[in-house]
Amino acid sequence: MATRLCPDRAQALIGEILYKWEWEKEMSYEKLNEKILEMKDEMFDTIRENVAICSVKGEPEEDAPYGREVKRALDHLLSVGEKMGFKTGNVDNRVGWIEYGEGEEMVGVLGHVDVVPLGEGWNYDPLGCEIHDGKMYGRGVQDDKGPTIGAVYALKAIRDLGLPIDRRIRVLFGCDEENGSSCVEHYIKVGEELPTIGFTPDAQFPAIF
């Protein structure tokens, strides 16, 4: 026989549940921040390694549709993902991805490894990824290698901490964002899985769109 709760007791019970949920959420955020800080040096090294690759669009080759250096940058991040133990995929060297989690639905996190030409006027080596006064300098640090690699390490932190997620998370590495995003068009055209929802950690995310 069901027990009927009085309104006051029901309200109190709901309050207890919400308090517990908020507390667990806050604790998860704290653990996540601690884990990311713990991995900071490793993450910075990965950013440096990728920024050192001058992945400006080049002459297409049979296995490198956007040029050899763009493929090198893609291969580097796929290798990082494999070493972390993530599931990885490579769509004709145009889009790569790493994935974690279970479920029918997939959240897409779309970044890119290609960059615009180095240009002039740098105070520091654009491929050196130097840190001065708490700021990292290099082509792609902000657009979009740094944020993309940050997303990879955020996913690693979620996995390592065993935080609950109810759908798969896929971090995608585009290779032609700076020249029209034909890479994403190809991903869709060949029938790759589309996310249920997603976001792009590009440049000054989330302040610009």
Enumerate the language-model features and the residues they cover.
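N-terminal helical capping/dimerization or prosegment-like subdomains
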Residues: 28-110, 115-118
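Active-site metal-coordination/substrate-binding segment of hydrolases
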Residues: 106-173, 179, 193
